[in-house]
Amino acid sequence: MHNVVISGTGLYTPANSISNEELVQSFNTYVAQFNADNAEAIARGEIEALTESSAAFIEKASGIKSRFVMDKDGILDPQRMAPRLPERSNDEWSVLCQMAIGAAEQALQRAGKTAADIDGVIVACSNLQRAYPAIAIEVQEALGIQGFGFDMNVACSSATFGIQTAANSVQLGQARAILMVNPEVCTGHLNFRDRDSHFIFGDAATAVIVERADQATSKYQFDIVSTKLLTKFSNNIRNNFGFLNRAAEEGIGARDKLFVQEGRKVFKEVCPMVAELIGAHLEENQLNVSDVKRFWLHQANLSMNHLIVKKLLGRDATEQEAPVILDTYANTSSAGSVIAFHKNQDDLPAGSLAVLSSFGAGYSIGSVILRKR
């Protein structure tokens, strides 16, 4: 069995950003038009009037102030309220592939690797652009990587599940190094007409190089000490979009074909599950929570992260102990915890212990214990 390290990370950030104020202006314009168009039905009590949103409400509910997006104009158009991403020919790289390439090239550079050093590609994300061929194989082709590639989906936990999958391949000698990528166009499955969730997501892509420790040469190395995964079925976060939708015409375009969640139930149920799993994971490795210098957590909701770390530490965490990026990136699903890792790792001294954890739909939770070399 080979010892395994993360030797490089990469980040692709879209050029466009939407502030809470911009998002609210679009949403409230839609609300005013809807209420005006349905005034008589609302007066008769047949339908409920929609309620306006506010930037203050969004920040208080989530900690989010802005988000990066692949398309801004389509989202902010009150007549559309969805990203506008023209279909590409089969001879062009797909949107997810384009994003993955941007993150992957940076990760390869930081790891000091070329395509010739990589034996496999894993694309792990919450929404795949198509059924087949695999996006990972397209990324493999775009970067000139030999070996194998495959896609996997564990929603917001896809990155930690992908890291374990990559680590297993390297540990067993099936690959020298694996490129694991998380391209997320979360705005594509978000209902921008839903007051409770229209602000939640942003777009981004991350990449991680997992390789044998004895061949790693970069200055960004972290030993993968241990990984631990957990899943438990729940309908509280769900998206029913799929290839069988066309077989049931009555459901096409329904609200459940986009992201839906029972937010309060998710908060109540997931926070203790995550804290318990991380705590048990550390204990299994004869490590104390007090030994952990940094927690890179899934970036979905600021209050969730505060509560999880408080359950673990028995006190409030500092900004250095549990870095936050969701204020400017929002929830980027599987990419979020890796963005926090990518942007907040260089200051840690050698020997520092850290935990990378993601959690979300499924329910699914992943924990990766890392030690900086």
Regions inferred by a protein language model and the residue ranges of each:
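Conserved small-residue
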Residues: 6-8, 58, 121, 162, ...
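Short beta-strand segments
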Residues: 7, 124, 153, 178-184, ...
